[in-house]
Amino acid sequence: MKSKLIILLMLVPFSSFSTENNFEINKTRVIYSDSTPSVQISNNKAYPLIVQSNIWDENNNKNHDFIATPPIFKMESESRNIIKIIKTNIKLPDSQESMRWLCIESMPPTEKSTKINRKEGRTDSINISIRGCIKLIYQPASVPSPVFNNIVEKLKWHKNGKYLVLKNNTPYYISFSEVFFDSDKVNNAKDILYVKPYSEKKIDISNRIIKKIKWAMIDDAGAKTKLYESIL
């Protein structure tokens, strides 16, 4: 009996993204501006992989604004391949960035096809599928590349009752690599991972007295900026 297990891995702020067990992506984000972008994936295992690439929106639905090609292919062991991102004719906002997710899923072929025994006397098996997702950010021609020292002035933090409110007055998706409340690093920062253009986020800070916020952003190359500070 065979079952399929999908493990989903999201973005981490490093120069490349590795799923540890299956494949490596050479970027943590894709910026789509003038040219057709691409990512390189590497199969460092001793057996081939079946790889599938798709574009998803922020609500975890398949998206048709972009196409990842090739959509499905086989990677031999110790090999590399390129996935290109192509924009369709669907119109996107031209006054701000738009974001999707490029998700790449891999699964080893059956043992019969690879001639590699990965079981020890078992009659059932589980095909483990690993999915790695990185941000795909569309930057229209009318929106210049971000200058992060200038962006800081347009990110506003303030308290409103039991909430800490972050307002993004820029046309950019702002991603954070780390956030500090006073001197305490926020470890469970899922609500502050990123903020959309011209929007705000509310973070519940019930029973906390916070006087200042420190934060570092992630730039277009996937690198961490310096720490910035706001007094509340």
From Swiss-Prot:
Subcellular location: Periplasm
Keywords: Chaperone, Fimbrium biogenesis, Immunoglobulin domain, Periplasm, Signal
Keyword Signal: yes
Pfam families cross-referenced by the UniProt entry: PapD_C, PapD_N
Gene Ontology CC, one term: outer membrane-bounded periplasmic space
SUPFAM superfamilies membership: PapD-like, Periplasmic chaperone C-domain
InterPro entries: Ig-like_fold, PapD-like_sf, Periplasmic_pilus_chap, Pili_assmbl_chap_C_dom_sf, Pili_assmbl_chaperone_bac, Pili_assmbl_chaperone_C, Pili_assmbl_chaperone_CS, Pili_assmbl_chaperone_N
Primary residence: periplasm
GO terms of biological process kind: cell wall organization; chaperone-mediated protein folding
Signal peptide (UniProt feature, chain positions): 1-20
Family: Belongs to the periplasmic pilus chaperone family.
Chain's role: Involved in the biogenesis of the CS6 fimbria.
Protein name per Swiss-Prot or TrEMBL: Chaperone protein CssC
